[in-house]
Swiss-Prot record:
InterPro entries (alphabetical): Ribosomal_bL20, RIBOSOMAL_L20_CS, Ribosomal_protein_bL20_C
Organism lineage: Bacteria, Pseudomonadati, Campylobacterota, Epsilonproteobacteria, Campylobacterales
Keyword set, alphabetical order: Ribonucleoprotein, Ribosomal protein, RNA-binding, rRNA-binding
Keyword presence, Ribosomal protein: yes
BP GO terms, sorted: ribosomal large subunit assembly; translation
Protein name (record): Large ribosomal subunit protein bL20
A cellular component annotation (GO) from this entry: ribosome
Biological source species: Helicobacter pylori (strain Shi470)
Superkingdom to which the source organism belongs: Bacteria
Assigned protein family: Belongs to the bacterial ribosomal protein bL20 family.
NCBIfam families, alphabetized: rplT_bact
Function: Binds directly to 23S ribosomal RNA and is necessary for the in vitro assembly process of the 50S ribosomal subunit. It is not involved in the protein synthesizing functions of that subunit.
CDD domains from the UniProt entry: Ribosomal_L20
Length: 116
């Protein structure tokens, strides 16, 4: 007797269509289109999780550079001075200081001033 895939197929289709909620038109309703779109969206999600890290780092660099230029120095000189002075603050923290707590950023800048 031939084995049919009725229950298995139904479960698989339901799983894919459930994940495809929020897609437009046939990409939500039709299994094949939904599966194709789901593969593509998973690829985008994987790729962009990596890209997000790059984008945030460049945003932090821009913010630190803007704060440094307000105090007549450049980003690269400031980062070099931090390294020479042995200050271990990462770019995320420095950017947050530059945006929200300028006095703290200025104190860090003063502490590495001799290494500039």
């Amino acid at each position: 007797m031939r084995v049919k895939t009725g229950v298995v197929r139904r479960r698989r289709h339901k799983k894919v269509l459930k994940l495809a909620r929020g897609f437009y038109s046939g990409r939500r309703k039709h299994f094949r289109k939904a599966k194709e779109q789901l593969e593509r969206s998973m690829y985008y999600a994987f790729r962009d999780r990596k890209q997000k890290k790059r984008e945030f780092r460049s945003l932090w660099v821009v913010r630190i550079n803007a704060a440094c230029r307000m105090h007549n120095t450049s980003y690269s000189r400031f980062m070099h001075a931090l390294k020479v002075a042995g200050v271990e603050l990462d770019r995320k923290v420095l950017a947050d200081m530059a945006m929200n707590d300028m006095q703290a950023f200025e104190s860090v800048l003063e502490s590495v001033k001799e290494h500039l």
